[in-house]
Amino acid sequence: MKIRSQVGMVLNLDKCIGCHTCSVTCKNVWSSREGMEYAWFNNVETKPGIGYPKNWEDQDQWQGGWIRGISGKLTPRLGNRVSVLSKIFANPVLPAIDDYYEPFTYDYQHLHNAPEGKYLPTARPRSLISGERMDKISWGPNWEVLLGGEFEKRARDRNFEAMQKEMYGQFENTFMMYLPRLCEHCLNPSCVATCPSGAIYKREEDGIVLIDQDKCRGWRMCISGCPYKKIYFNWKSGKSEKCIFCYPRIESGQPTVCSETCVGRIRYLGVLLYDADRIEEAASTEHETDLYERQCEVFLNPNDPAVIEEALKQGIPHNVIEAAQKSPVYKLAMDWKLALPLHPEYRTLPMVWYVPPLSPIQSVADAGGLPSNGNILPAVESLRIPVQYLANLLSAGDTGPVLRALKRMMAMRHYKRSQTVEGVTDTRAIEEVDLSVEQVEEMYRYLAIANYEDRFVIPTSHRELAEDAFPERNGCGFTFGDGCHGSDTKFNLFNSRRIDAIDVSGVRKHGEGE
């Protein structure tokens, strides 16, 4: 048994209001710079929809994640080593800029400089790539927000597989939910396996997946290898970049920027202990519907004396074990079985999990318009958001875990409503879903009224175990380019002119200001 610790995240989709605060703050802190204008390490999608980049869930097109061979051995869907190297100079499944969107700004200066005329001047869009004016903005990272666009395009959502999706195009049957997305910091990351330069690594102390900017050579195989498409190419520096899980904040015991600024308080951060020796076996499970349960078996109980003893022997700090015992992520994912992984069928064993949404369902149930099958709780299988859709998103098509999570959340609400409104303690609903009164009270505290220290339980890092960086910090500093010498190197493998900054406020062409 090889015990490792991982800082994981759970997002409660039942409380997400789609305000995009997490996206904006993450963008301002980490990717609001040249070469990364199109990149959003955190973005919020409206489901159903094809997402950002377009159709990112279609692995038949993008070849991300792992595939299980006949022998039971895992191979990147992109191909083995020989296959990856054979297309290193021309990757046929690399997303183009049009699959993301053409980043743009507006010609605000024209509002001040426009000559006096008959009509008010307007701020027209201008490309941040070419510097030219754009006739029309046709796509963006949140283009489908609030079900924007016609259903015919949103119906290409891969989560509609094995469903009669035509009926959900009708107004009476339509539904929506928000899905905040960031790098999953997987236990079995396919981006690490597909990088020819070996520049991507997973930190042992907290499981955060990072890209070594000095080793990265810009082959961009990691972009194709990542099934969640959360690695981006910086065209200015010629390097790949991704969400770093705000590791400078994590090291000091602070939550990530997206978690800190979340308006709905939907995010939970905590430590999980896992057995690294079980990863290959879990990811190689034959049936995709079993992957969720197999991943749960990888996690270790932090309250087990045998696990604690072995963890201390293997060098896991005591404060990390204490944090794992108080982890809200472990409670939501393992104790109560409410949180589920995003697309476990990719076999990467993701570590950012989601609580399925119940709010749009519960309002219908309260109206008494749903069958209850003779039980206290209504039949969640017949509610507005299709259970099969949520299962395709969160449990590889297996509706069992989704039904269990939804029923337990509904039972908690039924119990608390009878307690606060009717003044009685009705335990029939929670008994149906195998929950005790103590568990439900704790669930209510964490899901509804959790304090800051309940949602974020992050141990500080042990600097005494790290190498002394004093000789490096004065000469290197913090850069986003080619190591210590910034991003102005003239070296180019293909002997072509390097792309430099484009001044989008340059002199307008004749007739543009009219």
Which sequence ranges carry the predicted segments?
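Non-ligating segments of multi-cofactor redox enzymes
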Residues: 1-514
